[in-house]
Amino acid sequence: MTAFNSLFSLDKKRLKKLQRTLNTINSLKGQMATLSNEELQAKTTEFRKRLVNGETLDDICAEAFAVVREADKRVLGLFPYDVQVIGGLVLHQGNTAEMKTGEGKTLTATMPLYLNALEGKGAMLLTNNSYLAIRDAEEMGKVYRFLGLSVGVGVSDNEEEDRDAATKRAVYSSDIVYSTSSALGFDYLIDNLASSKSQKYMPKLHYAIVDEADAVLLDMAQTPLVISGSPRVQSNLYKIADELILSFEEQVDYYFDKERQEVWIKNQGVREAERYFRIPHFYKQSNRELVRHLNLSLKAHKLFERGKDYVVDDGEIKLLDATNGRVLEGTKLQGGVHQAIEQKEHLNVTPESRAMASITYQNLFRMFTKLAGMTGTGKTAEKEFIEVYDMEVVRIPTNSPVRRIDYPDKIYTTLPEKIHATIEFVKQVHDTGQPILLVAGSVRMSELFSELLLLSGIPHSLLNAQSAVKEAQMIAEAGQKGAVTVATNMAGRGTDIKLGKGVSELGGLAVIGTERMKSQRMDLQLRGRSGRQGDIGFSQFFVSFEDDLMIESGPKWAQDYFRKNRDKVNPEKPKALGQRRFQKLFQQTQEASDGKGESARSQTIEFDSSVQLQREYVYRERNALINGESGHFSPRQIIDTVISSFIAYLDGEVEKEELIFEVNRFIFDNMSYNLQGISKEMSLEEIKNYLFKIADEILREKHNLLGDSFGDFERTAALKAIDEAWIEEVDYLQQLRTVATARQTAQRNPVFEYHKEAYKSYNIMKKEIREQTFRNLLLSEVSFNENGDLQIYFI
């Protein structure tokens, strides 16, 4: 057990306990091997009975792990190593296991998934993409089925397939489900748009293991999953706003802080806009849409870079995943930003649709009773994992020692120097036949390096968002002798790079990074492509003072150094800066960048807390209606509330001479078009009783017509009101966040401003739901068609 020695000294208390459990599991190895297949399979029923009789998962953990270990050997021919068992124990505890590339995370997960599925509440493994989910479910599913558990797959290899509720219900009722994080998120949102029990399929979220946990739970945490609905009225302001913004001068008409990624219109820009549009007051309420479009255009031009944040493919804007450079198919920026980028690129501006429902990964995964994660790089973000998800990160030792050499960065003053030095280094390594993975920070830079390699006569493959369809083939060939692969950071995660014949003797895979990424974890992922399962290899990064990392997060003295020395260097004779302070500088700058990323994610949580509270409230009320339970939007209760509120309004705000008009208008707008006048002499109590009488008569008539279907009618009326109000609220909250963020330039706390306005909007939404339900119940027309189906027409 020497592999644990160094780790024990760092994390003695945590791993000693795991070691004791591992010893117990190992002691059961012989016993499990003597069992017949039938006896081994019978253990599942035994475990479930023991749980019913009061034992806990921890009580049966060692024995259950030993059972799965033996099943893995019999079914797959693979017996999990001790380090994989340790990883499985960490996952069972609801923590994140940091396991290096090639250490067998897929097999590791079989043990905690089996154990946690025994409770009958469901266990999920969520991967990065559909291919991995389907592959792992097929391969590992053999083990679970051998042990008597059912396995479901939440995704399909046919992207066009639209699964119905019954199919999804069968998937999610399985003991173990393999899916992707995005598929789960969208299924959750769709499930909460259901209008009847038959359309619902999602169980309570119990236990999940998230693969590439740091990428999903941290890096993608700020990206909401959004279901879009009906389009907004198409705006013609995008083009006008774009034209004006192009005439603006940076730091004169608008302020741009690249380090903080903030941009806003200054007073001079406001005056220019007022002159351009011939309006006296730019920020007047009537100019709200104009102000919004100008800010959107400004963001599109300054905060989103082609080749880095998005690509243009066949006339469409396609977003890039910041964590891996891959295209986010089917994903669009919300709130009009996407349309502003389309205008910036002179493309057809697509309709801006309203958000019907949305949720962030943070809030989705915080709904699980127990959450675990697997990743190759999580330890450096342990503090954030603990604060956000209450998950520790445990570094699992490798089964074989890591033999990769990570060389210190080669640091240059200017970008041209760095590029020249990188190409020369690639030539030297390529001459030895050693395979090379050259990683650039953006699509644009990857294409530049590709052109320079072509000019140097070095054949290579180019892997970026534009060529992702060939990814599997390129990665499979990247470890072959003489191979050179130029890629964006999408090469950092995914399929393992296996060394070809004779490559180990040449020194293994050479990973050459052309800049430090915004997060140390991304660099560690890239380094980890070399040295898989004890393979030999090395990594070398080339950096400069002109890299995005240094421009956005570097200290002032570094910027001063660059300005002072940039004209003193010869790009064709690059000179590396060897002083220790420069090595320290890039390390500290990356740490600062990591800190900014953490702060931004923390702010996302703060912003999203309002949305989450409202979402929980709306979904709870919807489910109460669907399940026939009493809730705040019980139709009977709403009749009383709306009429009582109207009477209170008459009593406090309406003059006596306007009373009849107000009552008649209320009846006509909300209750009935067959208006019956009221007497001037009627008291408020008599008016109240009169309104209740009208409501009772209308509902009695509908009840007589609908019979047993009347309950369905009431529920549908309330659900329609909730959904319409919630769609408006989700859309409004997205717009509000954009406005609130801009307000921090006025020395206001954007989160406080957002919560204040969101709370107002929340109360308005609840009032609107009650009033619209009232209208739906009374003003709607109901009938049965010739097939006997209920038809409801809401006004």
From Swiss-Prot:
Q: Which CDD domains match?
A: DEXDc_SecA, SF2_C_secA
Localization (cell): Cell membrane; Cytoplasm
Q: What is its EC number?
A: 7.4.2.8
One example of a Gene Ontology biological process annotation? intracellular protein transmembrane transport
Decide whether keyword Transport is in the record: yes
Q: Which UniProt keywords apply?
A: ATP-binding, Cell membrane, Cytoplasm, Membrane, Nucleotide-binding, Protein transport, Translocase, Translocation, Transport
What membrane topology term does the record carry?
Peripheral membrane protein
Q: Which Pfam families match?
A: P-loop_SecA, SecA_DEAD, SecA_PP_bind, SecA_SW
Which positions does UniProt annotate for ATP binding? Answer: Q84, G102, E103, G104, K105, T106, D496
Q: Which domain of life is it from?
A: Bacteria
Reactions this protein catalyses: ATP + H2O + cellular proteinSide 1 = ADP + phosphate + cellular proteinSide 2
Name any one GO molecular function. Answer: protein-exporting ATPase activity
Q: Which EC class is the enzyme in? A: translocase
> Can you name a GO cellular component term?
cytosol
Q: How does it assemble?
A: Monomer and homodimer. Part of the essential Sec protein translocation apparatus which comprises SecA, SecYEG and auxiliary proteins SecDF. Other proteins may also be involved.
HAMAP family assigned to the protein according to its UniProt record, in alphabetical order: SecA (MF_01382)
Instruction: Name the job this protein performs.
Output: Part of the Sec protein translocase complex. Interacts with the SecYEG preprotein conducting channel. Has a central role in coupling the hydrolysis of ATP to the transfer of proteins into and across the cell membrane, serving as an ATP-driven molecular motor driving the stepwise translocation of polypeptide chains across the membrane.
- Which family does the record assign? Belongs to the SecA family.
Name listed for the protein in its UniProt record: Protein translocase subunit SecA 2
